[in-house]
Amino acid sequence: MSMVCEFELNGKQEIFEFGKVAKQANGSVLAKIGNAVVLATVVSEFDNPVSEDFTPLTVQYVEKTYAAAKLPGGFIKREGKLSDFETLTSRVIDRSLRPLFPKGYVYPTTITVIVLSADKNVDLQALSLNAANAALYTSNLPIKKSVCGVRVGRVEDGYIINPTPEEMSNSTLDLYVAGSKDELLMIEMKTISSSQMVEVDIEAFTKIHNANEMNEDTLVEAIEFAQNALKEANLTYEKAFETASKEKFQVELVEFGIEESIINYIRDNFSNEIKEAIKKLAKSERATQLKDIAKVISKNDHCTMNEIEFSKIYEAVSIVKREIVRDMIVNEKIRADGRGLKDVRPISIETNILPSAHSSCLFTRGETQALVVGTIAGPKDGQMYEVLTDKSTSMERFMV
């Protein structure tokens, strides 16, 4: 049975329809604002926990070109790999929702957001995060908070929540903030691209150009403005979604950690060996030496009698290593491999090492190396790409 929640927020009518599609998912919702429609689903494998100390969360944000009544550009008329915007939006959703999972939640979880219909006046990034939050909050996963995202623009010294493209064209700020009703979880800000700058008059260009240099008070004011909007939105969501929420599944939260007795044993008996490995060896040699020290410890009577796993011993060695490195920096003013706090490894640069490339160089500093190759081509060789809410095709001329 589906359930519909409808309300007005920030001057726009929002509709969330739960349980209409993707009924086998732990949580699903069709979210609609204007002509924009996104499907968000949450699936978690409660019977397949991982053994590592992290939350196995995967987020996928996918745009379908049919959402804008278009066919994919190029020779292949099917969606290909994710665009930069899809990848970045997936990360935005991940960074915003990952903190909601309780510590010790080790069950593989996938959040998928698919854009089914697009509206150029609706911010798909904000809508997608809010839809993913709705699916997660009303699912049977142990999530107790609502999170949403808002974009803040600044036009004529006034702030706007989720501005339209027309308003953004005159904005001196593009700030995206995500959070719950009582805390901020993610902040992202970007400047207006140079291609957008040249299309406006000189007065607007000056304002936009000056956005690259924003004083701290203005930014704090914008964040506070966003925080107030987030509080209002999350209170609205939590109240509206209450009747649509499923009963929470009682999952076992796994406690990871090393017994203090093991750490104390290594700290008391092997600190000198670990410190010598840190001070005298290069990075790769240091890792090998620390693993050898852990093997010696694992054969010690203290570890064999208590049947302590090697992975736990090696993790305890790493904890003691971090303590020693910090003590060396704070008290002895030296870093790993014996360098002082102001010592910098020499850098070597070799140029034109690839005969057929237009330009190439090899940077080497310590064990870190970077091979950089440049290729110059004509204007027709740029990468064509399309934005879902824009009918025109754009050209990327600088690619890294």
Regions picked out by a protein language model, each given a short descriptive name:
Residues M1-E45, F249-S394:
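Extended amphipathic alpha-helical scaffolds
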Residues I15, E79-L88, N121-A126, E199, ...:
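Ordered, soluble secondary-structure elements with a strong preference for glycine-centered loop motifs
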Residues G19, A25, V29, T110, ...:
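Gly/Lys-enriched N-terminal cap/neck module of very large, oligomeric protein machines
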Residues Q24, D123-L129, S146, S171, ...:
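Short glycine/serine/threonine-rich phosphate/pyrophosphate-binding segments
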Residues P72, I76-R78, L88, V92, ...:
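Small-residue-enriched alpha-helical segments and adjacent helix-cap loops
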Residues P142-L281:
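Mobile "lid/hinge" segments at catalytic clefts and subdomain interfaces of large enzymes
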